[in-house]
Structures are given as structure tokens and as C-alpha cells.
Amino acid sequence: MQKTQMLSAEIFRRRGHIRKQCPLCKSHFWTLRPDQEVCGDQPCTPYGFIGNPPTKVAVESLRDVRERFLSFFERHGHARIKRYPVVARWRDDVYLVGASIYDFQPWVTSGAVPPPANPLTISQPSIRLTDVDKVGRSGRHLTGFEMMAHHAFNYPDKYVYWIDETTEYAYRFFTEELGIPPEEITFKESMWEGGGNAGECFEVLVRGLEAATLVFMHYEVKDGKYVELPLKIVDTGYGLERIYWLIKGTPTIYDAVFGPYLAKVRERLGVPEPPRDVMAKASIYFGQMDPEVISLDKAYDIIAEKIGVDGKWLREVVKPQEALYVLADHSRTVAWMIADGVIPSNSGAGYLARLLIRRALRGLMLAGVDAPLVELFDLHLKELRYDYPEVWEARSLILELVDMEEKKYREVLKSAPAVVKRALEENRRRGKAGLDKEDLVTLYDSYGLPPEVVAEAAKSMGIEVKVPDDFYSLLASRHVRREKGREATLVEMAKVADLPRTRELFYEDAYMRTFKAKVLRVIDGKYVVLDQTAFYAEGGGQPADTGVLRHSGGVAKVVDVQRVGHVIVHVVEGDVPQEGSEVVGEVDWERRYALMKMHTGTHVLIQSIRRVLGPHIWQAGAQKDIPFSRIDVTHYKLPTPEEVAKIERLANDVVQRDLPVYVKVMPRNEAEAKYGFILYQGGVVPAREIRVVQIGPDDEPYDVQACGGTHLRRTGEIGLIKVHKVERIADGVVRFIFTTGPHAVAYVQELERQAAEAAALGGGSKEELVEVVKRLLKRAEEAEKKARHYAELYAAALAENLKAEAVGQRRLAVVELDDEELAKRVALLATKRDPDLVLVVKAGERVTIYTGGVDVGPIVKALREIGFRGGGSKTFAQGVYAGDVEKLKEAIRRAL
């Protein structure tokens, strides 16, 4: 969509800004300089601040810039709010926060929920992998960055501020706080879109660098079209790292942001610091090049010519630095992610974390750097601990996971030749030559093989493979958004849209067993809508209630209950009630009460798992059922039996303490402010107000989650929590299967019965089970030893007494043996004793040929002529033959 209006601001008229159009990119921009011809943005304008910063303001760290920004906006009436996590657990469309506005989408931006303050200011760590392939190369791109921002939310009945004030704030911040001359600042008109919203914007440019973007958001993006929002939102983004780079004027953004860390890494690895003038010139030219037009390899040659150096020499200087820049950026981003609960894996946010770790590793390998990645990460964690204390708190977990990932990656690389060979052969069979981009994606996603490694392996087989310069960006783009499953509904929404919202009695009183209601609608003779119901509708991993509806015409059995929009639909069998009639509903209380124990038990268990295994534990799925329920959690290895026992003890301690369970409905902002985003253990709750389930007293709650299920009043009602099984169901996901209440008691009793039965078989009691098993194992070991001895004697006897016929200089023997291990032993002994022996072992249609030194090639060839199917090595063959044994012997005789 084109911009709907010329962007202007009162400050431009007041201060004499001139609106111009860039002859190169055709964009309009505002400037104080009559002689400025181009827009001031890359690639139209080269960097003019490298080695020549536009200000002499005294700032020594990112922290200084951040504090200047936040304090400036606090002084101008903005509330400073705490940064959000980088994992967007309050959203169901994306995994990671890509900008500060993500914190407020979709609830605040849609008008459903008020903002935490208005106006507000924040410095939000953000992650974008859109340009991951450019990181380390361009001199300016990052995957992780802090977006400093000020936001204002204008409602139809409440105006805060809009274009004029926003532009004035930006002008004053850059000139007054940072000391940048007014004539150095250009405001370029543009359009911005992200996170489902859009709006016109100003890009704030200084000497070729975009330092901030001022978005005037008033659209929602629906089906590719812009629809006006009820709100007008000021969405600004000031790049903390870019502004610090602008002030410092270093050759690259990495030298400014990660300077102390890079110095330590260079010292540790023995990598010299590059010539500053060369890196500065290279960075300026790299910044002007479009990687979609000019390949990276070609870019080196062009830049080398421009700065008057040899292309090979430039590569040797720059490439090791690129690897260090990638390491610096990726290690910080990965640290943020893991500290926020992301476990590297093959799916979701874990996929992106693994991608960054492996890209950092690959870069170091290509640069010839030999050092444990975990050691280099640790150097960075020590630098990050003051600005990001949560990263330092997660240090041991981060280092353990990085170490595990490096070991996995090195194992993956060993498989490359065989995997690539198979892929090439498969393509050849399908009439396809070589490997294309999609093949490279498949090999990465399925086997973890980076494209450079695939290309090397293919080259050794005489096949050239082109590696796209944007390969990792392509991978990331396919994994940054959450997949939304399509919700199936029992009946069409249109058939119930006119009905009032169903009153949810199961929320008003979870212990209600019977109720009276009026039938509002019957659809297709089996779907019943009531004005109110105590039947719980399936949701949040809790199955629907069952029971009956009694009415004047008989009894209808309720077999399922589902939500369709704002109404609850009962699926019934039997005597269907008439519309307008009165019914008495009876919930299957024994089943419902068991599910309530399972649901409250689930909350107790996941908190116990989190307290034992660590704060990185997040729910990845759950299903409450009878007699067993399951909960899937993010964890990188199978818990030990000792850890599982500790989890079980902790959970049952909560049961024994008989803690109160509170259910309260709270405004979303209030709940998030009080409890944090741990609320969303069970997933996103799409509502202005959320239902909060708290286990334990207010001053010391054991667990708090947003939840729509039915719960007990006290934990003592659970009775018992028993873990049945723990297993890894996917990379980075562990499943706990458990049971509660009477079902847990029944399960324990069954275990006791089995233990007693097993002990009795060994002649003991269940209390003596361990000793009985030890005794039986010892007997079994002795019996196995004797069996091996007798098997050796038997094999020796068979080998000694083989009836072999002479065939020229060879000897031929055919025996029938079903025991494959015995046959191998006989063959080993017999052929060792007689190298000229050809031993044929037949077991049904299976035929195996052993020799001590005789070439079986001619034998196999002869046998194929009579129907043998199989093959083998020089002295061994195996296959299938269904014909006559005498014909088989005759064919072998001819071959010998």
C-alpha cells in the first residue's frame, strides 16, 4: 500500500526544514541543509561517522546511552517500564520479541487491554534473524539488539500525542542529549509494517546511519490489506547499539558494542586486531552493497579494488574478524534466549537458538579457530552480567547447553559424506542433478548439516553445489512464526451466533453436580445449547465432562461438550430434549472429580519439576485423563531417577500441606505485573481479563498460572501424586506420565502386587525382591556361562564331523542349521581348519555361504542362474533360494 499522506511535523515548519526527494531512491526527506541532495540513508549515502563521529558527548558504555534515553523521556512525562522477556509467551503468532511494540501486540494495540502506562518508555532486548547471514559481514547487522522506545496510545476519547510531539522528542533527544548538530539529522519518510500492524514513519538518519524510526501506527494488516485501528499508536524504535556506534565512530558496530569482549577473545585465540583503517574503509563499502545483487565473494574483490589492496589479502584479514563478530553477536543472543527458557532443539524457538550456536561454530571452524565454544561463551557471560543479571544467573545452564550443542554438532559433521552421497544418489534416481537450495534446507533440517559442509562433501564427489548467501536467513524465516492449527468446530458459528453467551456454572462452582437449565437450541438432532451449564467444555488439555440431561421426554446422554464462540454445545445421544424445554443436568461426578485432581495435580507437578530441574522448564503440552495424565516440559536431557524421586517428594509434600487453591479473575495487566509471564505456563490466554489459579497463600504461593480448567479447593484433596514414567518424546522435550488420587493408589497397589508375584517366583517375599533378583541374576549368569561352554563344544563337534566332498582342489559341505550364531561358530572353526572348504548353511529358504579363502564370486554367479537372490563379500554370501538342494550343490560344483 502507498502512503496515504505526506508526513510532516510542526517542528519542520518552525525550524525551517526543507522537504526534498532523493534522486537515487525517490524517497522524500526533511533536512535543514539546502545543499543536501540525497536522502542520507544507505546505500544512497556512505557512512560519514566512521572515524569521525558527529558528537563529542561523553558516554563510555551502552548503559550510559540507555540511561540517557530513559531518563530523558522520564523527564518528559513518560513512565519507565521494565523490559519484557525475549520469548513472547503472551503471543500465539511469534516465538521471539522482534521490537518493543511486540510487548503490546495484540492486546494493547487492538484496544482490548490498556497499556501498562501511557505514555511509556522502555529499552527492550529484541531478536531478529531476518538478516542473520549479514551479521559479521556488513559491519552493522545484529541478531540481538536493544530497542529503546517511547510509546503513546491515543484513543478516540483520550489524546496523548502524535506526529508533532514524537518528532520534537526525537529532535531534542539527538540534539540536546547526544549533542548532534541539527543540520546532521535527516527525517526520511517511509512506511513500516510488523507484528500485524502498520503505519507511516520517519527514519531518523545521521551521516548515513539509521539511528531511529518513528512509526505512526494506525493500521491493522488483514489479508494483505490495511484496516484503520481504533487507536493511533506512537511506535518508536531507537537502536541502542547503533546510537552507541554512531557516537564512538568505530569501524564496525561490533567493535563498539562488543569491544572489551572481542579484545579478550582475540587475546585468548591469538588472533591479531585488524588494521583499523582497512576495516573502516571495508565497512563503509560493505554497508553500501546489496547482497541480493552482489554476492559476498564478488563484494570482496570490488572493495579490495576500491581501497587499493589485494582481494586475497583482504579476505585473510577480514574473514577471521567476521567469525569473531558472529561469535560476539550470536553468543549474546543465545544467552538471552536460554536465560528466558529456550532449549536448543529441532523446533520452535529452540530451532533458532541451535541455528545461531551452529553458525557461530561453523564460522570459527572456517576461520581455523580452535577453542571450546563454551569457553568463549563464558568470557562473554562475564561481560554481560551487569546489564543482564538474568543471564549470569543462568550461566551454568547456558554453558552446559552450549557444550552439549558443540558435541552434537561435531558428531553431525562426521556423518556428512555418507548423508550427502545418499542425497546425490537419490536425486540421480529421480533424474535430478546435484543439490539445489531446497535440498540444502532438507539436509540442514533433517541431519543438521550446514550447506558449506554439504558443498565440501559434494565437491569431493565431483559435484559443485552453490551455497546461497542468504541460506540461514531463509531457514530462520521459515521458523520465526508459530504454526496455528485450524480449530474444528462442532457446528457452524452462524447457527449459534444469535444466541446469548452460555452461563458457565462450572466456573461459579466447580463442585456443582446437578443443575437446571433451559434448552435454547437443538441442532442436527444431537447438538444441544442450554442457557447455562455445569458441564465443562473441553479446553486447556482437560477433557469435556460427561453425564446426562433429564427432561420430560426421557434421558439424553451427554458424550461431549465443546465451545463454539461464546456458547457451549452439548453432544447428546438418546432422547433429545425439545427447544424451550427445561432439563436437569447431572455431571458424572466421579469422573469430573478425578479430572479436577489431575488438573490441580498438574499445576503442582510442573512447579515441582521447575524447582528441581531449573527455571528453564516450561510446559510444552499437557493432557489430563484417567487413569493417567501427561505433561510435556522443555528439558535437554532425561531426568535421573534421583531427580524424578525428588520431584515426586516435593509434589506430595505440597499435597500433604493441604494448601488452599484460589481462583480469581484479574485484569491482564494487573496479573502480569503481579506474577510475571510465568502465568502463561499453559499457553496464551486470549482475553482482556484472565482467570488465575494460585496454589498457596498470597505471601508465599507455590504456583500461579493463568488457567481455564476446573480445580480443587485444597491440594490435600489430590491425595497422592505418582509419576508412572518419564521419557524423551522429542529433542528438548521430556514427558512426565503421572496419576493422582485413587488412581495413584491403585497404581501403587498394582506395583506392590507385581513385586510380590515376582518375588514369589524366586522363592521370596516382596520385601526380599532385590535379593531375590540378585540371586536369580547370579543363577542366570552361571547358566549362561555353562550354555556358552556347551555351545562351543557342540560347534567344535559339528565342525570336526562335517561331511565334505572333494570338488577338485576344494571341499564342499552342506548342512542345515536354524541357529544363526551356532552356524557362524561352526563356519569359523571349520574354515579356519580347512581354508579350501566351502560351507553352505541352509535354514529354510535362507542360504549362507562361508569360505576360508575361496572367492565366492563365481559361486554366487552360478547360483543366480538357478534362482538364488543375494550377494556378499569375497569370502561370504547370503541370500534366498527356494529350489532343490541337489541343484544347489551341482551349481556350486560347476563354479568350483
From Swiss-Prot:
Any one GO biological process: alanyl-tRNA aminoacylation
Secreted recorded as keyword: no
SUPFAM superfamilies: Class II aaRS and biotin synthetases, Putative anticodon-binding domain of alanyl-tRNA synthetase (AlaRS), ThrRS/AlaRS common domain, Translation proteins
Main location: cytoplasm
Entry GO CC: cytoplasm
Reaction catalyzed: tRNA(Ala) + L-alanine + ATP = L-alanyl-tRNA(Ala) + AMP + diphosphate
Cofactors demanded by this protein: Zn(2+)
Principal EC category: ligase
Positions bound to Zn(2+): 599, 603, 707, 711
A GO molecular-function annotation: aminoacyl-tRNA deacylase activity
Pfam families listed in its UniProt record: tRNA-synt_2c, tRNA_SAD
Protein keywords: Aminoacyl-tRNA synthetase, ATP-binding, Cytoplasm, Ligase, Metal-binding, Nucleotide-binding, Protein biosynthesis, RNA-binding, tRNA-binding, Zinc
Bound cofactor: record note: Binds 1 zinc ion per subunit.
The keyword Isomerase is annotated on this UniProt entry: no
Enzyme Commission (EC) number: 6.1.1.7
Compartments in which it is found: Cytoplasm
Homology family: Belongs to the class-II aminoacyl-tRNA synthetase family.
Domain notes: Consists of three domains; the N-terminal catalytic domain, the editing domain and the C-terminal C-Ala domain. The editing domain removes incorrectly charged amino acids, while the C-Ala domain, along with tRNA(Ala), serves as a bridge to cooperatively bring together the editing and aminoacylation centers thus stimulating deacylation of misacylated tRNAs.
PANTHER family: ALANINE--TRNA LIGASE, CYTOPLASMIC, ALANYL-TRNA SYNTHETASE
Role summary: Catalyzes the attachment of alanine to tRNA(Ala) in a two-step reaction: alanine is first activated by ATP to form Ala-AMP and then transferred to the acceptor end of tRNA(Ala). Also edits incorrectly charged Ser-tRNA(Ala) and Gly-tRNA(Ala) via its editing domain.
UniProt name for this protein: Alanine--tRNA ligase
Organism of origin: Pyrobaculum calidifontis (strain DSM 21063 / JCM 11548 / VA1)
Gene responsible for this protein: alaS
